[in-house]
C-alpha cells in the first residue's frame, strides 16, 4: 500500500486509536479489543515498552485488517527501527525535516505535528496533506481547530492530544478531517480482561458518534 493509499485510509475511517499501556502485552491486548470494536487505524506511541514488538505483533496478527503506525517519534533512529518493524505510518510531535525526509524515502506516510498557525502553514507550504495539531487540548480544543481551518482552509488536520470521547463530534464539526484519541479512550485499568471487554464497547460507542462530512 502506497503512502497515498494510506492517506485515503485516514480520510475513510477518520478515527485513530492511540494505544495506552504499561507493557507490550497489555498494548497487544488493548489492540485486539479496539480492533474487535471496529477501529481500523492504530497508533503505537514509541514510549510504550516494547513498542517495536507491539507493532510487529499487531501487523502479524491482523495483516491488512488494520493500519498500524508509530506515534511521537523524535529521531531518525527510532523511525528506522519502526520501519524495520513493518510500520505503515508515523506521527511526529513537531516539524522534524530529517525524520520527514527519512520516512518519505522509505515510502512511509508521515504526519508531522504543528501547534501554531505559523507551524501548520509552513508544513502545508512544503506539501504535507495531513498535519497533526498537537496537543490540541492545550491550544483551545475544537474551537482552535475551527480557527486553523478558516486560516488554512485547504489543509487536512488531524486533531490529537487531550480529547475525550464526548468531544469527538465537536472536532469533526469544527473541521478536523481525522481525530486521534488516546487517554480519552483507554482506561487506566487496561490490560485486565473485564477492562478489555469495556474497551471494545467504548470503541463501538466512539464509532457511533456523529461526524460532520469531510471537507
Question: What is each of the regions a protein language model found here?
Answer:
Residues 1-86, 105, 154, 165-166, ...:
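Conserved N-terminal beta1-alpha1 strand-loop-helix module at the mouth
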Residues 20-21, 70-76, 92-95, 112-117, ...:
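Glycine-rich beta-to-alpha transition loops that act as phosphate-gripper elements at the mouths
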Residues 26, 54, 77-78, 98-99, ...:
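Short acidic active-site motifs
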Residues 40-41, 88, 109, 129, ...:
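Residue-level detector of anion-binding/catalytic polar loops
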Residues 89-99, 132-141, 175-196:
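Glycine-rich phosphate-binding active-site loops on the catalytic face of alpha/beta enzymes
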Residues 93-139:
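Histidine/lysine/aspartate-rich catalytic loop segments that bind and position anionic ligands
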Residues 127-132, 144, 153-154:
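A contiguous pocket-lining binding segment that forms or flanks enzyme active sites
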Residues 139, 145-151, 200:
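A charged, well-structured terminal subsegment
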